[in-house]
């Protein structure tokens, strides 16, 4: 029998267990796919015992550009996003190459045209 370790994600300002993360099923993100995301590769350096994110600033700029096209406002600075990603990766204790999905989504109740409130999750996968 395989016993998987509980994973953590960052959701709207809090690091939570994946099994406890909740998004409203009637939110525009669930009803209409109202979200934008970036997948960021991180590479483990065994000699330095460190994970390194690949082209982080470029990924964040694309995330901002995607949100702008969708008329969503990212409520966080690039520096905050980097800090949140580091916190989330550390909470999981990864010592291997990983990908980190960072997703901005339209939360709450709304229609196809809703652009707020904007929620976010960061999920190492």
Residue ranges and their predicted role:
Residues 1-125:
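Conserved alpha/beta cores of soluble small-molecule-handling proteins
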């Amino acid at each position: 029998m395989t016993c998987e370790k509980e994973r953590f994600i960052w959701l709207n300002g809090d690091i939570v267990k994946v099994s406890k993360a909740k998004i409203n099923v009637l939110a525009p993100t669930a009803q209409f796919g109202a979200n934008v995301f970036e997948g960021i590769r991180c590479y483990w350096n065994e000699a330095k015992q460190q994970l390194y994110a690949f082209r982080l600033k470029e990924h964040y700029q694309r995330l901002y550009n995607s949100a702008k096209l969708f008329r969503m406002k990212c409520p966080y600075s690039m520096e905050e996003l980097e800090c949140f990603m580091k916190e989330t990766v550390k909470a999981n204790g990864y010592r291997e190459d990983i990908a980190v999905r960072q997703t901005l989504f339209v939360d709450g109740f709304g229609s196809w045209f809703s652009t707020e409130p904007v929620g976010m999750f960061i999920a190492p996968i």
